[in-house]
Regions:
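A generic short-segment signal for beta-strand/edge and adjacent turn/coil regions
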Residues: 14-19, 48-53, 98-104, 161
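Conserved NTP/Mg2+-binding pocket subregion across the NTase superfamily
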Residues: 65-174
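Short helix-terminating capping/connector loops at secondary-structure junctions
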Residues: 21-23, 41, 74-77
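Short helix-loop boundary/capping segments at the starts of domains
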Residues: 18, 53-56, 69-73
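Generic detection of long, well-ordered alpha-helical segments
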Residues: 2, 6, 57-60, 153, ...
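Catalytic metal-binding acidic patch
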Residues: 31, 36-62, 78-85
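Short secondary-structure capping/turn segments at boundaries of alpha-helices and beta-strands
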Residues: 14-16, 33-37, 48, 67-70
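Helical scaffold of the NTase/Pol beta-like nucleotidyltransferase catalytic core
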Residues: 1-28, 59
Length: 174
């Protein structure tokens, strides 16, 4: 199983390097994989891609297409990815702007109209405050410099609000 996870991570890294080239700042693993409690049957693979500049629509589409291929090698819960700009990692803003999300929850929309979905898939996300905090403390740099060189401090109030928001949504989603 560890070999399978390593293959998935290598594919993610190769895909991002190919698509974003010099625009890619880093790829950071968080969640159960970073905490060392990953369970193939119950966990997803959580990661954040950081770029210097906003990706083009074509880059977003290519990323989603490649992640859908990689997802076939993944656990049932799949991949959960957010693409964010470097400026918001370093100079934190809450709720945090994002360029693209990918997860099982979005798959159907990707298949319905990939271009339209990628064109409109951006906004802000309160969950990123918690993700950034975890990445800075326990995250794994799959590619790029260490997390503490990319991610600034998240104010405690934003971190706690992010967790509160996640708990409130968990009740609805369960």
């Amino acid at each position: 199983m560890e070999l399978q996870i390593q293959k998935v991570l290598e594919q993610i890294k190769a895909t991002c390097m190919d698509i974003f080239s010099t625009n890619l700042v880093g790829i950071y693993i968080h969640g159960s994989l970073a905490f060392g409690c990953f369970n193939w049957d119950k966990s997803d693979i959580d990661f954040i891609i950081v770029t210097r500049l906003s990706p083009t629509l074509q880059e977003k589409e290519k990323l989603v297409e490649d992640l859908l291929k990689i997802d076939k090698m993944c656990p049932r819960k799949g991949l959960e990815m957010s693409l964010v700009l470097e400026e918001y990692c370093h100079d934190f803003l809450y709720p945090t702007p994002f360029e693209l999300h990918f997860s099982n929850a979005h798959k159907q929309k990707f298949f319905e109209n990939l271009s339209e979905y990628c064109a409109h898939m951006n906004g802000t996300d309160k969950d990123l405050a918690a993700h950034f905090t975890i990445i800075k403390q326990s995250g794994i740099a799959l590619y790029g410099e260490k997390a503490d060189g990319v991610f600034g401090d998240v104010p405690k109030a934003n971190y706690l609000d992010s967790i509160k928001h996640d708990i409130e949504n968990a009740v609805v989603e369960i």
